[in-house]
Design a protein with these regions (language model features):
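Catalytic cores and adjacent flexible loops of soluble metabolic enzymes
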Residues: 1-300
Length: 300
């Protein structure tokens, strides 16, 4: 959720700097009017938290000022999410961090210094449970600007967990983010895009969201772990690897060549790496085509 009112996030003002960017989907709107249209009524929060709990979901919110933090504390809000445009609001970050709840911070418009200051502020407040979200603050965000390799770097550079706040259309970015180490995915949700709304164009409906979750779980399973140990299934598959076999009927004393002993499937014969060692030597017995080649067939 997002917990704000138009008055806690901006000023009721007609100056040009209080207008939405001309390149955004909200071009021409006053920020005050946009936020007045987009905000979630605070009186809805209690019921949303209650229903989420009944459904086994974790409900939490982004506060946009200290009054929102105080209000959310009354609902036992379990996590605080700092939006991209609030990452420079150090007093807000400090106030929320002191509640000693996990802190999630989006980095859409943040410089490296902004991020470091926000992380340091949390830690100075005694709160080290921090997740940084890679975010592209365009609505919708072009997928070629997702820059998902940042997810891994955020975790390593700042010593935190990392994830993705995704404003691209579709689920590709979210699935790829998991392969980059994302531990959290934020995606806008809408029941029906046809009803419209400030974020309708880049929100997912129920079916799309469910499919995204399935795809993410499959991606997590596909990542696996670094291991060169063969599973039982892989070991059985080695039966179909290459090995040395007698390719022509051979008589005792016949010289081994690349024509009469070859590296072929299946894998029950001598390892192919030994072919160069046996070429030019003689076999010590008659051998039938299709015989697994072994050291014991070579004259000593």
């Amino acid at each position: 959720l997002q917990t704000y009112t138009a008055d806690t996030i901006t000023l009721d003002n007609d100056k040009i700097e209080f207008m939405a960017d001309s390149t955004s989907v909200w071009a021409g709107m006053r920020l005050y009017d946009l936020y007045k249209q987009a905000y979630t009524p605070w009186e809805w929060h209690e019921e949303l938290f209650r229903v989420a709990k009944e459904e086994g979901l974790i409900c939490f919110s982004s506060p946009f000022d200290k009054t929102a933090v105080d209000f959310l504390e009354s609902l036992d809000n379990p996590i605080y999410k700092i939006a991209s445009f609030e990452i420079t609001d150090i007093p807000l970050i400090e106030y929320a961090a002191k509640k000693m709840k996990p802190m999630v911070m989006s980095t859409g418009i943040a410089t490296e210094e902004d991020i470091q200051l926000a992380v340091d502020t949390c830690r100075a407040a005694g709160n080290d449970d921090i997740t940084l979200l890679k975010c592209t603050s365009s609505y919708p965000a072009p997928i070629e600007e997702a820059n998902l390799c940042m997810i891994k770097d955020l975790a390593e550079r700042y010593g935190v967990k990392s994830g993705l706040s995704d404003h691209t259309i579709g689920s590709v970015s979210a699935v790829v983010a998991v392969t980059q180490g994302a531990t959290m995915i934020e995606k806008h949700f809408i029941i029906d895009r046809s009803i419209g709304g400030p974020d309708a164009s880049f929100s997912m409906n129920e079916q799309e969201f469910a499919q995204m979750v399935k795809d993410i779980r499959m991606a997590e399973a596909a990542i696996g772990s670094v291991s060169y140990e063969l599973t039982d299934k892989m070991k059985s598959g080695r039966e179909f690897s290459r090995s040395l076999y007698v390719a022509e009927d051979m008589k005792a004393g016949e010289v081994i060549t690349e024509q009469n002993v070859r590296s072929v499937r299946p894998g029950f014969g001598l390892h192919p790496k030994y072919l160069k060692d046996i070429l030019g030597k003689k076999v010590n017995q008659d051998l039938e085509k299709g015989t697994r080649f072994a050291w014991e067939f070579v004259n000593s």
